[in-house]
From Swiss-Prot:
Subunit (UniProt): Homohexamer.
GO molecular function list: ATP binding; pantetheine-phosphate adenylyltransferase activity
Protein's UniProt name: Phosphopantetheine adenylyltransferase
Alphabetic keyword roster: ATP-binding, Coenzyme A biosynthesis, Cytoplasm, Magnesium, Nucleotide-binding, Nucleotidyltransferase, Transferase
EC number(s) from the headed UniProt entry: 2.7.7.3
Catalytic activity field: (R)-4'-phosphopantetheine + ATP + H(+) = 3'-dephospho-CoA + diphosphate
Gene this chain is encoded by: coaD
Length: 159
């Protein structure tokens, strides 16, 4: 059974992330969205809320599970029995970092392969950082995130 682990901070999860998860759910038996605590990134949303938002966005996909984690990714992958890391590549600029990460992960978890997917063209420009910036300035983010995520961002910046 192929179990793919899609790690990220997902602060917040975007339609680009959702697109990759939907496509992965057709390719793999089981997809785990691994939401990283990422305290050094100082996330806008706490881990628990990011996990809940990802669950809401993917609830229509029966073979997708969302789990928060704060350990080393290689250890988490082993705990979950994952045999593939899934990563998205939006542009050539993503490749260099992802290539380094894949090689490091190969050293730490040699039994887990790294697989890269490119997003659908309509989502290739979306990033969580840009979505947060637009939301913070009161812009319309409905094209970039699920309605539940848009509501959470609106509420967060209302404070």
């Amino acid at each position: 059974m192929n179990r793919v682990l899609y790690p990220g901070t997902f602060d917040p999860i975007t339609k680009g992330h959702g697109d990759l998860v939907e496509r992965a759910s057709r390719l793999f038996d089981h997809v785990i969205i691994a939401v990283a605590a990422s305290p050094k990134k100082n996330p806008l949303f706490p881990l628990e809320q990011r996990v809940e938002l990802a669950r809401e966005v993917t609830k229509h996909l029966p073979n997708v599970e969302v789990i928060g984690f704060s350990s080393l990714l290689a250890h988490f992958a082993k705990e979950q029995g994952a045999n593939v890391f899934l990563r998205g590549l939006r542009a050539v600029s993503d490749f260099e970092y992802e290539f380094q990460l894949a090689n490091m992960n190969r050293q730490l978890a040699p039994d887990v392969e790294s697989l890269f997917l490119t997003p659908s063209e309509r989502y290739s420009f979306i990033s969580s950082t840009l979505v947060r910036e637009i939301a913070a300035l009161g812009g319309d983010i409905s094209k970039f995130v699920h309605p539940t995520v848009a509501d959470a961002l609106t509420e967060r910046f209302r404070k």
